[in-house]
Amino acid sequence: MEIHPSLVVEPSYPDLIIHAGEVTLGEKDRNKMDSKKKRLEKARITEAACALLNSGGGVIVMQMSNKSEHPVEMGLDLETSLRELIPSSDLQAFIETKQQGDLFYIFVKSWSCSPKDGSTKPRICSLSSSLYCRSLTSKLPLDSKETFEFLERKKTCVKGSLTDGKGPPAKIPRLMYQNDLESNPAFEIFQSERLEYGQRLPFSESASIEFKQFSTRRAHEYIKSVIPEYISAFANTQGGYLLFGVDDESKRVLGCPKDNVDRDSLKAVVNEAISKLPVFHFCSSKEKVSYKTRVIDVFKEGNLYGYLCVIKVERFCCAVFSEAPISWMADKENGVYSLNTEKWVRMMVDIGPEAASSKQSSLDDLSKDFECQLSLSNSPPHCRPVYSKKGLEHKGDLQKRLFQVSADCFKYTPESLWRELCSQHERLENLISQQMCSFSCGLLILSRSWAVDLNLEGKQGVICDALLIAENSPPTLYTILEEQDELGQDYCTRTAFTLKQKLVNTGGYTGRVCVMTKVLCLSSQNNIETNGNSVSLIDYPRSYNLANIQEMEDLLQALVIVLLNFSSFLSDQLGCEILNLLTVQQYEILSKSLHKTRKLFVHGMPGSGKTIIAMKIMEKIKNTFHCERDSILYICENQLLRDFIRAKNVCRAVTRKTFMTPNFEVEKIQHIIVDEAQNFRTENGDWYMKAKRITQRMKTCPQIFWIFLDYFQTSHQKESGLPDFLHQYPKEELTKVVRNADKIAEFLQKISEKIRSNPPPIIPRESLNMVCEFNWSQGVSGTCKLLTSLGLEQMARYVAERCYFFLKNGYSAQDIAVLFSTEDEKDNNEDMFLREIRNRTSQIDDAYHLYMFDSIRRFSGLERSIVFGIDPRTAEKSIFHNLMLCLASRARKHLYILSKVPNPFNF
């Protein structure tokens, strides 16, 4: 990454503002300029525009060196440069200009590859791709569209060969290309030991042959300058021969005089120049450019005169660049910076989920079980694809539920928070109403901290933040302070900037957008705004106002993605980040005020997303209370779930047993999240009272104690340590199952009703009434099979056959769990099952099988696409159905329960 030396990103605005220094504007004045200065100014402006197009949009600010009282145009060379930068016929769709005094502004909208004209477009903008190809006798640079198509062809070629072979991405065979080169007429010259000065070659330049003459004494520098573009062109086409020392008109051998070069230095210069060429592989190869160099003696009148240098270049499997592509990005941490070759290619064609051909099963699951909410083919460069489970609400439906916009109606939302804030601060309603009096259509979306909602640190002294989304107005973020605070504007600016960036780069908003800021102080006698920098110093064009309800809804749908997104389990399987969306039920729990809800019991049905909410709430705790990682403690019962959470690095994660050891360090702990609490025990002491004491030590500082549990998944009959159900207050419920396929969810519902009708004595009956609200996201196909009256060897063979089927069809061992009733049964039978599987496939190595076999209890809280339950049973018959529920809910897509007895469930 190279930082731009002369472009400066302004840190104190809620937008990306790039200062480009002094620039001469106007066609007449620019034509009078020194050519070098003119070229440097054009480069600065184009590079700044490139950075903003690729980074979510923003503003270029220029100081006009030629003062003018009258409006001036940019200048034709600047307009042409910007038009060439943007791979779109409509420059004005992305660029607007405005002059204010001696400042000139270029307003840049984020690039998006939306193919409105029906053509495919690159994901990012670039000044140069540094990719070349041969066309007849010329080397041609590829423009943005050609580059995108070239890279897409290469990617598709590898993907096609991979899909056919069902294996890892293979190297593309080189033999056929080598045969072509050896049948080339230049091959005979390449094989020669000596040539005569003035000898006429029996062939001319072509798509695979290029002549270059040594016309300078600086032969080494000349070769270095020629090689990058020509080698890139040959390698990216069909390969070819580059001959140094031939006159391209007469086709006569001239060579390079031996007084200017020697044989070894010629080879060294060629090797050095080619070794520096960047390459990118879509396939598994790691090879650089394949070439051979021959330095051939040239004789004149019987004496050695000099040398002819011939480079034979083979066609490259993927892409060869003459240098790193020239493309820029910007952020407030690094300023304006260039992209390296690998990142540029990955962003250019965006190697998203569709490129994960080796994970065909996961791709199938994605296409069959999820609905796309945000596609890479119609979004800004930094966006990740967003999918929702089939049967869950679309982003448009979520927007209407959370942020409904109505014509001729202005609303404060959420209403409950608005009423609560007004009751707590008597002057607040009047203060905000004064600001809103001119708006008749839109929303004021209130939050105790928009910063925390955006995963930033909150700020003490902020009563609330309010986001205005209104007709004929740009989005505006209001921060209301209790007392005057000089850092209030910084907080508001930082929050507004993050919101604007996330609306584009996460939410996929493709319209023009800025977020204005206003800081109000409740204690001010005149209800005036606080002092501080304001983005209003830049007068944005009217096109940045939300013109109508449709534009407001588009922006609010992007906001829904910003607020409700979380990383999907498919991200790890596909090797690229994919986002899912929370349900409204999950979001409402997550939106609770932590200052008011210091303690909460969250009861959730199996597969309703309890652990996701636990992770998200820990992130919110960190930002609300400015916590270090070790201040937040996550406690669960089993080690696998502990390890899963620990890897997220948001908290300190331990098991209950570790938490209850006498020497467990609690000094730094301020907040505690308990997960899977129904399976906790008191054999090592009263964990609940210990956690409660820790989170009540500091009366002046709020400390959080949230407990997630599901009595339906209780897997023992011992005392859990939880308070009586009636004393579990406040309490929230998660009743929508979002994990499992339809047939598995139906099975879960049946077992849940069975448990409710005949609960184990240890479970409070009232806790099971939530099964009446049980529902799931329907539309996901899957398998739920019960096979009975089988012996263990039959089970092992069946599991092996199904594993072979799934592995052959693109699943991996990481997608499969084989669960036994107890750890002893797992230890006793694992080898037999593993042996049967390995007899059929070689895809199970030692690293994978460690995570493939486990006990039902130890696997609690985790999930897999495919789950086999091996002869599930319990010593305590009263909790048999609970254990079955725990087993079945682990399976996302395919569930197989294999039993020795004829009818284990009595359905």
From Swiss-Prot:
Phenotype when changing K42A: Reduced endoribonuclease activity
TM region(s), chain numbering: none
E.C. code: 3.1.-.-
Domain of life, source organism: Eukaryota
Active site, per annotation: E205, E210
Outcome when changing C283A: Renders the protein insoluble
Consequence of substituting D34A: Reduced endoribonuclease activity
Effect of R39A: Reduced endoribonuclease activity
SUPFAM superfamilies in alphabetical order: P-loop containing nucleoside triphosphate hydrolases
InterPro entries, A to Z: P-loop_NTPase, Poxin-SLFN/SLFN_N, Schlafen, Schlafen_AlbA_2_dom, Schlafen_AlbA_2_dom_sf, SLFN_3-like_DNA/RNA_helicase, SLFN_GTPase-like
Documented effect of changing E210A: Abolished endoribonuclease activity
Top EC class for this record: hydrolase
Domain notes: Shows a pseudo-dimeric U-pillow-shaped architecture of the SLFN13 N'-domain that may clamp base-paired RNAs.
Name the record gives this protein: Schlafen family member 13
Native species: Rattus norvegicus (Rat)
